[in-house]
Amino acid sequence: PLLGDIACGKPIVAQDNGDSYVSAADTEADFCLIAKGDSMVGARIYDGDEVFIQQTDMVNNGEIAAVVLDDEATLKRLYYYPTEQKLVLSPENPAYEPLVFTGEELNHVHILGRAVAVQGRLR
């Protein structure tokens, strides 16, 4: 199902609009989100692209993840440093700063899943 939008820039309010469906061949996706913004252009994820997400709360370092921060959703490359108790959500555009969470802030971060495919227009 197409659940709604996900920020590729400043996080946006997470809303479930799961009344549409999008088809993608040979993906292990559980749902799809529409990219909004340009923070992930270095990973070839552009504004308006359909991003297919495999639902999981475990994402490997360096994978692109859909993440909810309180009630706002964003798509970023995820890095976790357990010895420092630090999570970094890194954009793929130098115009944006990474989002860094430590200590108590980590309780406000929820991983929805990992990006497994992207579908968009030829550029």
Region spans (language model):
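Short acidic low-complexity segments
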Residues: 53-60
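Short, positionally conserved secondary-structure boundary motifs
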Residues: 1-47, 61, 73, 80-86, ...
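Well-ordered beta-strand positions in beta-sheet-rich domains
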Residues: 50, 75-77, 100
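Short solvent-exposed strand/turn elements
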Residues: 89-106
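Well-ordered beta-strand positions enriched in small/hydrophobic/aromatic, beta-favoring residues
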Residues: 33, 65-67, 89
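Residue-level recognition of conserved beta-strand positions in structured domain cores
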Residues: 77-78, 91
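Hydrophobic beta-strand signal
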Residues: 52-53, 66
